[in-house]
């Protein structure tokens, strides 16, 4: 997993409640187990019409949000069935951060495992960020994990917290496999002792 300390990027506002994993990546695209290649299918049914043409009114199809790497969502973001493909699609599309008032627990954990920083903040903060991004497409924020701050050049400043384990994983660029490999010698010693 790529380490995360400070990230500055364009904000895409998608503040809808209960965005579920089937909306994030529809089931017809879940035929592979590789982590890459899912970005083109992110929010597919919202981004494209039945003929496969981009819907111009969808935020991610608008030029001001091209290259966005910070997604702002609504309450209960990532609800529905557990599918790791959802954060894989978010990450593969180019998002490093998702900010929402609440996340579905399993989705939140899948984001950590996939290298997408999921930040919980108040609805008031989400609305303030979204309003700025809607008013000024291309609006950028800086997310500083070490300091626990979200800031904008316009003076916006929001403090946030993530649990210590998640913080460590992101700062050090460790996924579950990386964490396990840090204990490879102890695991080998245990296996020898119990063989």
From Swiss-Prot:
This is 3-isopropylmalate dehydratase small subunit. Catalyzes the isomerization between 2-isopropylmalate and 3-isopropylmalate, via the formation of 2-isopropylmaleate. GO terms for biological process: L-leucine biosynthetic process. HAMAP family: LeuD_type1 (MF_01031). It catalyses: (2R,3S)-3-isopropylmalate = (2S)-2-isopropylmalate. The lineage of its organism: Bacteria, Pseudomonadati, Acidobacteriota, Terriglobia, Terriglobales. It comes from Koribacter versatilis (strain Ellin345). The keyword Amino-acid biosynthesis applies. Its EC number is 4.2.1.33. Coiled coil: none annotated.
């Amino acid at each position: 997993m790529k380490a995360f300390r400070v990230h500055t990027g364009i904000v895409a506002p998608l503040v809808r409640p209960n965005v579920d994993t089937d909306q994030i990546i529809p089931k017809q695209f879940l035929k592979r187990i590789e982590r890459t290649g899912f970005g083109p299918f992110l929010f597919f049914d919202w981004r494209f019409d039945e003929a496969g043409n981009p819907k111009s009114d969808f935020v991610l199809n608008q030029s001001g949000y091209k290259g966005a790497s910070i997604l702002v969502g609504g309450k209960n973001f990532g609800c529905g069935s557990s599918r790791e493909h959802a954060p894989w699609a978010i990450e593969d599309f180019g998002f490093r951060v998702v900010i929402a008032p609440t996340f579905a627990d399993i989705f939140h954990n899948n984001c950590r495992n996939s290298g997408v920083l999921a930040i919980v903040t108040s609805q008031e903060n989400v609305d303030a960020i979204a309003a700025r991004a809607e008013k000024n497409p291309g609006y950028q924020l800086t997310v500083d994990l070490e300091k626990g701050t979200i800031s904008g050049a316009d003076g916006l400043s929001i403090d946030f917290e993530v649990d210590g384990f998640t913080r460590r994983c992101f700062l050090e660029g460790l996924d579950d496999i990386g964490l396990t490999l840090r204990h490879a010698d102890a695991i080998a010693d245990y296996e020898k002792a119990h063989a």
